[in-house]
């Protein structure tokens, strides 16, 4: 999603609150909870879940391994839910031609660097760079080359844009910023 006028362009970044992240966190939570309950029922010797008789799963080694997988899965699920709650990776890219400044803001993990804020002068932007890697794990990324700073990614690598959409976005941004486009 973006907002644009003659002198200002704001590009809003989604972050971790995507449908796929909600689905993965929910599936991982349910699966790991199931593993933990099966491991616990094998330890107690009675059915916590009525799907599996506790006599079929011996605590050592199957019950221990299932309990370990359940606990590990719950930790990973907790991590995913925290990134969704904190909305890690969301923010905006603001390009202001009137002031000649580019502002990039992202939310991070809680702590000293929770708010990630970068500011550049437009005159320091060398180019807009497109990096396209086709194949099994196709990757299309849009970068902004800053003099003395290197390349800053403007689009997340997990967003599935087609090559045409990336090229269109790069062309519009390069035209707005009045800088050349590089393709790698």
UniProtKB/Swiss-Prot annotation:
GO terms classed as biological process: photosynthesis
Keyword entries, A-Z: Chloroplast, Membrane, Photosynthesis, Plastid, Thylakoid, Transmembrane, Transmembrane helix
InterPro entries: PSI_Ycf4_assembly (IPR003359)
Keyword Thylakoid: yes
Pfam family, one: Ycf4
Record flagged with keyword Chloroplast: yes
Subcellular location: Plastid, Chloroplast thylakoid membrane
Transmembrane segments: 22-42, 57-77
Its membrane topology: Multi-pass membrane protein
One GO CC term on file: photosystem I
Domain of life: Eukaryota
PANTHER family in the record: PHOTOSYSTEM I ASSEMBLY PROTEIN YCF4, PTHR33288
HAMAP family named in the record: Ycf4
Function per UniProt: Seems to be required for the assembly of the photosystem I complex.
Similarity-based family: Belongs to the Ycf4 family.
Name of protein: Photosystem I assembly protein Ycf4
């Amino acid at each position: 999603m973006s907002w644009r006028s003659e002198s200002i362009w704001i590009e809003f970044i989604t972050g971790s609150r995507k449908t796929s992240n909600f689905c993965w966190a929910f599936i991982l939570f349910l699966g790991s909870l199931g593993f933990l309950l099966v491991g616990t029922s094998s330890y107690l010797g009675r059915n916590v879940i009525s799907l599996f008789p506790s006599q079929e799963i011996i605590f050592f080694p199957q019950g221990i391994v299932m309990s370990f997988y359940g606990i590990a899965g719950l930790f990973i699920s907790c991590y995913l839910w925290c990134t969704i709650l904190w909305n890690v990776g969301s923010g905006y890219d603001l390009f202001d031609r009137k002031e000649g400044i580019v502002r990039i803001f992202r939310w991070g993990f809680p702590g000293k660097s929770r708010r990630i804020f970068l500011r550049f002068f437009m005159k320091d932007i060398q180019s807009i760079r497109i990096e396209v890697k086709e194949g099994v794990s196709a990757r299309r990324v849009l970068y902004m080359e800053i003099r003395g700073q290197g390349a800053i990614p403007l689009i997340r690598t997990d967003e599935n844009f087609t090559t045409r959409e990336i090229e269109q976005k790069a062309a519009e941004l390069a035209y707005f910023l009045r800088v050349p486009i590089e393709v790698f």
